[in-house]
Swiss-Prot record:
<keyword id="KW-0805">Transcription regulation</keyword>
<protein>
    <recommendedName>
        <fullName>Bifunctional protein PyrR</fullName>
        <ecNumber>2.4.2.9</ecNumber>
    </recommendedName>
</protein>
<dbReference type="InterPro" id="IPR029057">
    <property type="entry name" value="PRTase-like"/>
</dbReference>
<feature type="short sequence motif" description="PRPP-binding">
    <location>
        <begin position="101"/>
        <end position="113"/>
    </location>
</feature>
<comment type="function">
    <text>Also displays a weak uracil phosphoribosyltransferase activity which is not physiologically significant.</text>
</comment>
<keyword id="KW-0804">Transcription</keyword>
<dbReference type="Pfam" id="PF00156">
    <property type="entry name" value="Pribosyltran"/>
</dbReference>
<dbReference type="InterPro" id="IPR000836">
    <property type="entry name" value="PRibTrfase_dom"/>
</dbReference>
<comment type="function">
    <text>Regulates the transcription of the pyrimidine nucleotide (pyr) operon in response to exogenous pyrimidines.</text>
</comment>
<comment type="similarity">
    <text>Belongs to the purine/pyrimidine phosphoribosyltransferase family. PyrR subfamily.</text>
</comment>
<keyword id="KW-0328">Glycosyltransferase</keyword>
<dbReference type="GO" id="GO:0006355">
    <property type="term" value="P:regulation of DNA-templated transcription"/>
</dbReference>
<keyword id="KW-0808">Transferase</keyword>
<dbReference type="GO" id="GO:0004845">
    <property type="term" value="F:uracil phosphoribosyltransferase activity"/>
</dbReference>
<dbReference type="InterPro" id="IPR050137">
    <property type="entry name" value="PyrR_bifunctional"/>
</dbReference>
<dbReference type="InterPro" id="IPR023050">
    <property type="entry name" value="PyrR"/>
</dbReference>
Amino acid sequence: MSDIILDSKSFQSAVSKISREISDNNKNIREVAIIGIQNKGVFLAKRILAEIAKLAGIGRSLIPFGTLDITLYRDDLDDLGSKIPVIKDTVIPFDTSRKNIILIDDVLYTGRTVRAALDVLMDFGRPKSIQLAVLIDRGFRELPIEAKYIGIRYQSEELIKVECKETDGVDRVTFIK
């Protein structure tokens, strides 16, 4: 059984809210680069990139875009036992130095995914800044990590499922009981 936290309309509203806030807080859009954390963060990042480019009145290709996989940087690899994690692509085809990196993921919970993402990102250089954007902030942090841009706050230790049109055919966030 599941309860809907965000339907398609409120999902898009949350993405638009994040996009506007990023645009408002980064007046020099030429210094911004967008990086999505695999998997769902990449799809959200592409949407946010499109909205930011539209707000700035420029083409999407003028804002650097990358994808980041944290698999090899996870702090729980030993706990996975014989389960072999699937490694996705990390593609950052631009110099991260002197860029305000907008790091995007679907859910912020313990902070461990973001910690791993920061480790990966620092291997690519020293950005001017790193700003975290998430669709859902669940609270219950285990590490001192906070998002600057949040679609919605939904404090819960229960499982949350994020579905995106690109992979699931629908935009929706549900609380799984």
